[in-house]
Amino acid sequence: MKAKDIVLKKSEEIEGLAIEGPWLDEVESLEGVISYYEKIGFQATHLGKAVKIWRKVEEKRKGGEEVRVFLGYTSNIVSSGLREIIAWLVKERKVDVIVTTAGGIEEDFIKTLKPFILGDWEVNDAELREKGINRIGNIFVPNDRYIEFEKYMVPFFERILDIERKLKRPLTASEFIYEMGRYMDEVLGKEKEKSIIYWAYKRDVPIFCPAITDGSIGDMLYFFKEERHDSKLVIDIANDIVKLNNLAITAKETASIILGGSLPKHAIINANLFRGGTDYAIYISTAVPWDGSLSGAPPSEGVSWGKIKAKADYVEIWADATLVFPILVWMVMKA
């Protein structure tokens, strides 16, 4: 075979979407640019597909069809400015079930007291420790936020104890968080109106947190119980798994939107295993699959477990959620 025949090998014709980006003289808005994403290629295409999937879910819901939307996110999502976007989604009844970590609860509450501050990645962390400043990436959290948080948690724990005495049973973590929303409604001012927990309480959206003690809430519980050795305060996580699984089982269809990985991701897709898998899935993550971690497992791996239906409409965007989630929400809800 001649070298030219090898290099210029004849190809078969294929059909598909032509790769194309926006011609900037022809688009008049960022929305117009983003409308090209599906045709750009690489992760832009994945973001474009995510827009289509979520729009399909929204159209069904607006048409009266039941698609129960599960939203999962790790605590760093709430550390960032994505917190307000999630709170808006809850306020507007765009999500039905939330699963997060302890940080996703406590940081939402703390931000109603004092803000987190934009810092830098390249700093002397030992000096920050001396100053009592905690760092989450390039976000700084002075420790007085946690001191203030404890001032609110002590009377809140007392309230939970009273409720549990009256009910003669422990509250589940989701009930604990619901009562936190009620507490915020009573003791906080206007600042609560950008809180996820507050709007979940107002809209009756359950927030599940299977690892509720794995954070500052756990620290506060430790201090509370150590200082009151007779304290009977208990949080029940066993009954929450029944409630979460049943929310998946009883839905006609489900959509799972997951920011990051870890416990929230698995809690949602595992609940959907009980119904034969979720129907729609959007993952946004920077985790990689080759270490076998759940955080890095792509949707297709979930299919092998029965947690995502084989015929489900799904996509994973490998990107920092702070970059793409605002675009995704805007394109689905506002464009």
UniProtKB/Swiss-Prot annotation:
Its required cofactor(s), as named, are: NAD(+)
Task: Give the record's pathway.
Answer: Protein modification; eIF5A hypusination
What the entry lists under NCBIfam families is as follows: dhys, PRK03971.1
GO CC terms in record: cytoplasm
The gene behind this protein is dys
**InterPro entries per the record?**
Deoxyhypus_synthase_arc, Deoxyhypusine_synthase, Deoxyhypusine_synthase_sf, DHS-like_NAD/FAD-binding_dom
Q: What is this protein called?
A: Probable deoxyhypusine synthase
What is its EC class?
A: transferase
Q: Which family, according to UniProt? A: Belongs to the deoxyhypusine synthase family.
Is the keyword NAD assigned to this protein?
Answer: yes
EC code? 2.5.1.46
Q: Which Pfam families match?
A: DS
Q: A GO molecular-function term, please?
A: deoxyhypusine synthase activity
Report the protein's function.
Catalyzes the NAD-dependent oxidative cleavage of spermidine and the subsequent transfer of the butylamine moiety of spermidine to the epsilon-amino group of a specific lysine residue of the eIF-5A precursor protein to form the intermediate deoxyhypusine residue.
Catalytic activity annotated for this protein?
Answer: [eIF5A protein]-L-lysine + spermidine = [eIF5A protein]-deoxyhypusine + propane-1,3-diamine
Query: Which keywords does this chain's UniProt record carry?
Result: Hypusine biosynthesis, NAD, Transferase
Residues annotated as the enzyme's active site: K307
